[in-house]
Amino acid sequence: MKHWCVWVWFTAGLFMACSSENQWLDTALNLAGDNRAELQKVLDRYKEEDGDKYRAACFLIENMPFHGAYEGKALENYRKYFSEYVSFPYSRHVQELIDSLKRADGEFSINQLTYKRDIMTVDSAFLVNHIEWAFKVWREQPWGKHVDFDTFCEYILPYRIGDEPLSLWRKEIYECYSPILDEFRKTDEADNPKVAAQLLMDTLRKANYRNTALFPVGPHLGPDVLKWHTGSCREFTDAMIYVLRALGIPCGVDRVMVLGDNNASHFWNFVLDKEGKTYIANLPYEEVWSKAEEYSISRGKMYRATYSIDKEAVRKLGKYSDVYPAFRCPFFRDVTALYTGSRNWTVALPDSLLSGQFREGDMVYLCLANRLQWQPIGYTFFKKREARFEDVGGGAVFTLAAWNGKEYAAVSSPFLLERETGKIRFIVPEAEKQELVLYRKCHLTLSVLFNDRMIGGVVEGSDRADFGWKDTLLLIKEAPYRLYTVARLKSDKPYRYMRYKGADGCFCNISELAFYENTEDTIPLYGEIIGTPGSFEDNTHEYLNAFDGNPDTSFDYIHPDGGWTGMDFGSPHRVEKVVYTPRNEVNFIYKGNLYELLSLIHI
């Protein structure tokens, strides 16, 4: 990976002196070496035959020096993680698969692979095939008339998504998914690519996806992501892109380098409607494409991946010998403003609020916290005695930093940029100690979904095993926010059977349930566990889990409605107290564990 970045930075340097598009193309052809003749064949073919195809070929070739793929024996070892996870038993943790592959093949590192540059290897037949298929779907689809040439080049034409092995993927994927749109093409909405994308996403969501971010870091997988459905957000976004681009729908991937409220980056898909507006989705979790400005992600800075390098950024950065690695290869555009809408802010700090000496034009980085350190997510140039960052999303804590080529140093105090107002509030240590009550180790993610699924759930008592008649003793009105929620029941009536019944659409998600005869009791009532058998996907999330004493296991009913879990006490008992735990990500505070609080001031 390091050698690739060096090559890209070196190559970018060759282009910095280019003042015209022809010079960019000539420089790319010169870098092709012995492969120049193959690329020239493509240009010669289209120069007289089709002006648009010639321009498209120029676009691909002039940016080709910055693209390539990895190869080597270790690549197959890496791909095993994804292919074997498809059939790996649900009852076993993914770490078991990882450990097994490490024992068999050794530790994987991307440094074990060899990087092959497209400019030196892509032949004319390959390039012509992709150009012909891209133009076919662009010109034949009813929505193609709303896709301009520049959008086509950037978000339909590219033959690759990232650094995956080269392949002729368009024809096979087109023939597989095109029939889904046959009836749609006859409708009045057939000119809207967003509606077509919705139909395709409906089909893609039917697959069984297995999400994990625990696999080693490696290259993109290529179109095999469509048959494996395993990996993280990167693999799932790639799958969507292959299908949409094969059908001539302009799309791609937007991302944040680091989330404002989590120690991770994130990728998601975007699609452009017939007016060029951005709609986004996270496959397979979201059912519909939504407007970009409605995305509730903690923003900071949002970037759109592109095949073409940002030529203007290359020219601006050319005079700087030390640029933070994430910005040396600018295959992206800043699209923050598309997401922030009216909450699009400017962060401007004068030199009086910065530590150190800055000269006119010095680079300054905007940073978010990531795993005990600050990570740059944007840059600007120090001008007129201030560091000014345009288009920033709020709702996160930032700092500014300088980079010397080896390490960076914070040059401002941390500050909160308020999402709604854009106001900057600096974070300074308080002189006095404060008391905090913490219920979780980090912010809610999936837990929001799981916690909310308990809203509308009920605790019921009955003297009939089938609950043919029952009394509702508790209605859960709010999402639980702690590991154990204690609810006191007001009924004096004894019951032989008691249960928790989940609300419709919630798969009866619950982790722990306990019934107590008296409010002061610490030992729950015991009996025969009863409930609706069957759990979603893997048969390891049965109703029995609600009474196993382990808050890390849970009940996930096979159907969204009608699930319940409970207990037959053998004889009627009064129950004054119920304790329950929502299905969770093991994110709660556990008694007996040792925790350490870290302040952003000291990161």
Model-flagged regions — what are they?
Residues 16-17:
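C-terminal motif of bacterial Sec signal peptides marking the signal peptidase cleavage site
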Residues 24-33, 46-48, 183-203, 212-223, ...:
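Hydrophobic/aromatic-rich core segments of domains that either
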Residues 40-41, 49-228, 264:
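Secondary-structure boundary elements
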Residues 343-356, 603:
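A short, amphipathic beta-strand motif
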Residues 360-379, 461-465, 469-470, 475, ...:
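Short amphipathic beta-strand segments in non-cytosolic proteins
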Residues 386-399, 403-406, 492:
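Short Pro-Gly-centered beta-turn/loop motif in secreted/extracellular proteins
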Residues 405-431:
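Structured interaction patches on ligand/partner-binding surfaces of diverse proteins
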Residues 431-471, 479-600:
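Aromatic, loop-rich ligand-recognition surfaces of beta-strand-rich domains
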